[in-house]
Amino acid sequence: MTTSVEYIPVTPIEYPDEDGKPMAEGDLQRKCLVYITTVLEIYFQKRPDVYVAGNLFIYYEKGYPESVVAPDVFVVFGVEKRDRRSYKTWEENDKTPNFVLEITSKATRSKDQGAKKGIYAFLGVREYFQYDPTGDYLNPQLQGLRLVENNYFPVATNTLADGTVSLPSEVLGLELRLEAGKLRFYDSATDKTLLTHEEEANARKAAEEKAQRLAAKLRELNIDPDSL
């Protein structure tokens, strides 16, 4: 007697690339997200082993697509710099983010300070920063946490002479600064704020126009600007 075995096809596990929700709640959040990802990509452009991403799903348990988190911005060291539709830790030698930043809003505040914080600690995210571009839902407006023995502790805040708030990121080697309520990344090695390509072009144009006005003023005074 021959025993037949019924073949039951195995349905492949799907790991969605999106959840249908908008990337950002409003213009402030969107502009902030674009600024952060852009300047960090520029800053690490010569590092093929540093991956910067924004609003990308991170799946951290193979076979369990519900084990997922989507940071607004994250940076991973020690992985290939390439485009991804999602980030699956088991495909990246179990590398998890070293740095995460959440752009906090009314809808995300409780999750950013609760469930996500726990997940990031579980994943070993060394630094976790939060920023509220409106200043309405997070006080102080810019906050940082650093992981020490599986627990997060606040990153010390420095207030500069001009009132600028500064928090150092050991992971990035940069400072996160709050200038008039606006988040900027600052490189102390070059003493410069990180700018997008568009901001650099605008700053260069403004400097050129200022120089032209000054030269014109000197000529009015019968002074050759080229002689100075």
Language-model region placement:
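A structured, charge-rich N-terminal accessory region that forms the first stable segment of a protein
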Residues: 25, 30-40
